[in-house]
Amino acid sequence: GLPAVAVGDCGTGVIPVSRIQCPGDHSPFAGQTVSVEGIITMDARQQGGFRGFYLQQADGETDNDPKTSEALFVYTHRTDGQHGDRVHVSGRVKEFHGLTELTDITSITRCGNGRLPEPVSVTLPWQDGEPPEHLENMRINVAGELTVINHYNLARYGELTLAAKPQTMATEILEPGPGAQSRHRWQAINRLLLDDGL
Protein backbone atom coordinates (compact mmCIF):
# COMPACT_ATOMS: atom_id res chain seq x y z
CA GLY A 1 0.00 0.00 0.00
CA LEU A 2 0.85 3.66 -0.16
CA PRO A 3 1.34 6.28 2.52
CA ALA A 4 -1.22 9.08 2.67
CA VAL A 5 0.82 11.07 0.17
CA ALA A 6 4.00 10.00 -1.60
CA VAL A 7 5.35 12.98 -3.49
CA GLY A 8 8.88 11.99 -4.48
CA ASP A 9 8.20 11.86 -8.23
CA CYS A 10 5.18 14.14 -8.40
CA GLY A 11 5.42 17.01 -10.85
CA THR A 12 8.79 15.96 -12.28
CA GLY A 13 9.66 14.73 -15.74
CA VAL A 14 6.08 14.39 -16.95
CA ILE A 15 4.82 14.60 -20.52
CA PRO A 16 1.30 15.98 -21.05
CA VAL A 17 -1.12 13.22 -21.96
CA SER A 18 -2.29 15.20 -24.99
CA ARG A 19 1.23 15.08 -26.47
CA ILE A 20 1.25 11.31 -26.12
CA GLN A 21 -2.21 11.01 -27.64
CA CYS A 22 -1.55 13.59 -30.41
CA PRO A 23 -4.23 14.44 -33.00
CA GLY A 24 -3.69 11.24 -35.02
CA ASP A 25 -4.54 7.58 -34.55
CA HIS A 26 -1.04 6.53 -33.47
CA SER A 27 1.10 8.02 -30.72
CA PRO A 28 4.52 9.40 -31.70
CA PHE A 29 5.74 8.04 -28.34
CA ALA A 30 4.78 4.42 -29.07
CA GLY A 31 7.48 2.11 -27.72
CA GLN A 32 9.01 4.80 -25.51
CA THR A 33 9.02 4.92 -21.71
CA VAL A 34 7.37 8.08 -20.39
CA SER A 35 5.98 9.57 -17.19
CA VAL A 36 2.54 11.16 -16.93
CA GLU A 37 0.45 12.63 -14.16
CA GLY A 38 -3.30 12.84 -13.81
CA ILE A 39 -6.46 11.70 -12.06
CA ILE A 40 -7.67 8.09 -11.89
CA THR A 41 -11.16 8.49 -13.35
CA MET A 42 -12.08 4.80 -13.39
CA ASP A 43 -10.37 1.89 -11.65
CA ALA A 44 -10.94 -1.43 -13.46
CA ARG A 45 -8.25 -3.56 -11.81
CA GLN A 46 -10.72 -5.71 -9.89
CA GLN A 47 -11.24 -9.40 -10.66
CA GLY A 48 -12.70 -9.74 -14.14
CA GLY A 49 -12.03 -6.08 -14.97
CA PHE A 50 -9.99 -4.44 -17.70
CA ARG A 51 -6.76 -4.97 -15.74
CA GLY A 52 -5.93 -1.33 -15.40
CA PHE A 53 -7.29 2.16 -14.84
CA TYR A 54 -8.13 5.27 -16.80
CA LEU A 55 -6.02 8.35 -16.12
CA GLN A 56 -7.05 11.81 -17.30
CA GLN A 57 -5.29 15.15 -17.18
CA ALA A 58 -6.71 17.43 -14.50
CA ASP A 59 -8.83 20.40 -15.52
CA GLY A 60 -6.58 23.41 -15.97
CA GLU A 61 -3.71 21.24 -17.24
CA THR A 62 -5.14 20.42 -20.66
CA ASP A 63 -3.86 21.80 -23.96
CA ASN A 64 -7.33 23.09 -24.98
CA ASP A 65 -6.89 21.41 -28.36
CA PRO A 66 -10.20 19.78 -29.35
CA LYS A 67 -8.31 17.33 -31.59
CA THR A 68 -6.39 15.60 -28.79
CA SER A 69 -7.49 13.29 -26.00
CA GLU A 70 -6.46 14.14 -22.45
CA ALA A 71 -6.64 10.57 -21.12
CA LEU A 72 -4.83 7.22 -21.24
CA PHE A 73 -5.54 3.68 -20.18
CA VAL A 74 -2.91 2.33 -17.77
CA TYR A 75 -2.57 -1.45 -18.09
CA THR A 76 -1.26 -2.77 -14.78
CA HIS A 77 -1.82 -5.21 -11.94
CA ARG A 78 -0.21 -2.81 -9.45
CA THR A 79 -2.65 -1.79 -6.75
CA ASP A 80 -1.28 1.70 -6.03
CA GLY A 81 -3.76 4.56 -6.19
CA GLN A 82 -7.53 4.50 -6.37
CA HIS A 83 -10.43 6.31 -8.00
CA GLY A 84 -10.05 10.08 -7.60
CA ASP A 85 -6.35 9.99 -6.72
CA ARG A 86 -3.79 12.11 -8.54
CA VAL A 87 -0.96 9.80 -9.53
CA HIS A 88 2.42 9.94 -11.26
CA VAL A 89 2.86 6.93 -13.57
CA SER A 90 5.87 5.71 -15.56
CA GLY A 91 5.54 3.10 -18.28
CA ARG A 92 5.81 2.28 -21.97
CA VAL A 93 3.43 3.74 -24.54
CA LYS A 94 1.64 1.14 -26.63
CA GLU A 95 -1.09 1.10 -29.26
CA PHE A 96 -3.38 -1.84 -28.47
CA HIS A 97 -6.17 -2.46 -30.98
CA GLY A 98 -6.40 1.27 -31.64
CA LEU A 99 -6.27 2.22 -27.95
CA THR A 100 -3.34 4.29 -26.68
CA GLU A 101 -2.21 2.93 -23.32
CA LEU A 102 0.67 2.71 -20.88
CA THR A 103 2.00 -0.76 -20.17
CA ASP A 104 5.08 -2.30 -18.52
CA ILE A 105 4.49 0.07 -15.61
CA THR A 106 7.62 0.72 -13.55
CA SER A 107 6.15 3.05 -10.92
CA ILE A 108 2.91 4.55 -9.66
CA THR A 109 3.22 7.36 -7.13
CA ARG A 110 0.21 8.80 -5.36
CA CYS A 111 0.39 12.59 -5.34
CA GLY A 112 -2.70 13.23 -3.25
CA ASN A 113 -6.43 13.49 -3.78
CA GLY A 114 -7.46 14.94 -7.10
CA ARG A 115 -10.64 16.46 -8.48
CA LEU A 116 -12.29 14.46 -11.24
CA PRO A 117 -12.12 16.26 -14.59
CA GLU A 118 -15.42 17.57 -15.86
CA PRO A 119 -16.95 15.24 -18.46
CA VAL A 120 -17.05 16.37 -22.08
CA SER A 121 -20.58 16.83 -23.42
CA VAL A 122 -21.28 14.82 -26.55
CA THR A 123 -24.28 14.23 -28.77
CA LEU A 124 -25.21 11.50 -31.20
CA PRO A 125 -24.84 10.80 -34.09
CA TRP A 126 -21.06 10.48 -34.26
CA GLN A 127 -19.95 12.95 -36.90
CA ASP A 128 -17.40 10.70 -38.62
CA GLY A 129 -19.24 7.45 -38.22
CA GLU A 130 -17.55 6.33 -35.00
CA PRO A 131 -16.56 7.74 -31.59
CA PRO A 132 -13.90 10.39 -32.25
CA GLU A 133 -10.27 9.77 -31.40
CA HIS A 134 -10.09 12.93 -29.29
CA LEU A 135 -12.51 11.41 -26.76
CA GLU A 136 -10.49 8.22 -26.29
CA ASN A 137 -10.42 7.14 -22.62
CA MET A 138 -12.05 10.40 -21.48
CA ARG A 139 -15.04 11.08 -19.27
CA ILE A 140 -18.09 12.03 -21.32
CA ASN A 141 -21.67 13.08 -20.72
CA VAL A 142 -24.14 12.18 -23.47
CA ALA A 143 -26.80 14.83 -24.01
CA GLY A 144 -30.39 13.63 -24.19
CA GLU A 145 -32.06 10.36 -23.39
CA LEU A 146 -30.67 7.04 -24.61
CA THR A 147 -32.53 3.81 -25.33
CA VAL A 148 -31.23 0.32 -24.61
CA ILE A 149 -31.42 -1.52 -27.95
CA ASN A 150 -29.29 -4.58 -27.14
CA HIS A 151 -28.52 -6.32 -23.85
CA TYR A 152 -27.30 -9.66 -25.21
CA ASN A 153 -23.88 -9.32 -23.54
CA LEU A 154 -25.13 -7.79 -20.28
CA ALA A 155 -24.86 -10.91 -18.12
CA ARG A 156 -21.55 -12.09 -19.58
CA TYR A 157 -19.65 -8.86 -20.24
CA GLY A 158 -21.69 -6.12 -18.54
CA GLU A 159 -22.36 -4.44 -21.88
CA LEU A 160 -25.36 -2.52 -23.15
CA THR A 161 -25.82 -1.01 -26.61
CA LEU A 162 -27.49 2.38 -26.33
CA ALA A 163 -29.00 4.54 -29.06
CA ALA A 164 -30.21 8.11 -29.36
CA LYS A 165 -33.63 6.81 -30.44
CA PRO A 166 -35.37 3.43 -30.56
CA GLN A 167 -34.13 1.39 -33.51
CA THR A 168 -35.51 -1.45 -35.61
CA MET A 169 -34.00 -3.64 -38.29
CA ALA A 170 -33.89 -1.47 -41.41
CA THR A 171 -35.53 -4.16 -43.54
CA GLU A 172 -38.49 -4.34 -41.17
CA ILE A 173 -39.67 -0.98 -42.46
CA LEU A 174 -37.87 -0.69 -45.82
CA GLU A 175 -37.36 -2.93 -48.81
CA PRO A 176 -33.84 -4.37 -49.07
CA GLY A 177 -31.68 -2.01 -51.10
CA PRO A 178 -29.99 1.39 -50.94
CA GLY A 179 -32.64 2.91 -48.67
CA ALA A 180 -32.34 0.16 -46.08
CA GLN A 181 -28.55 0.29 -46.27
CA SER A 182 -28.57 4.04 -45.70
CA ARG A 183 -30.85 3.67 -42.69
CA HIS A 184 -28.62 0.91 -41.28
CA ARG A 185 -25.59 3.23 -41.54
CA TRP A 186 -27.51 6.06 -39.90
CA GLN A 187 -28.54 3.81 -37.02
CA ALA A 188 -24.95 2.62 -36.54
CA ILE A 189 -23.63 6.14 -35.96
CA ASN A 190 -26.38 6.79 -33.42
CA ARG A 191 -25.16 4.08 -31.05
CA LEU A 192 -22.63 3.65 -28.30
CA LEU A 193 -21.51 0.72 -26.18
CA LEU A 194 -21.74 1.05 -22.40
CA ASP A 195 -19.46 -1.28 -20.43
CA ASP A 196 -19.34 -1.67 -16.66
CA GLY A 197 -15.57 -2.27 -16.70
CA LEU A 198 -15.87 -5.70 -15.11
Name the predicted role of every residue range.
Residues L2-L198:
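Extended non-catalytic accessory segments flanking core domains
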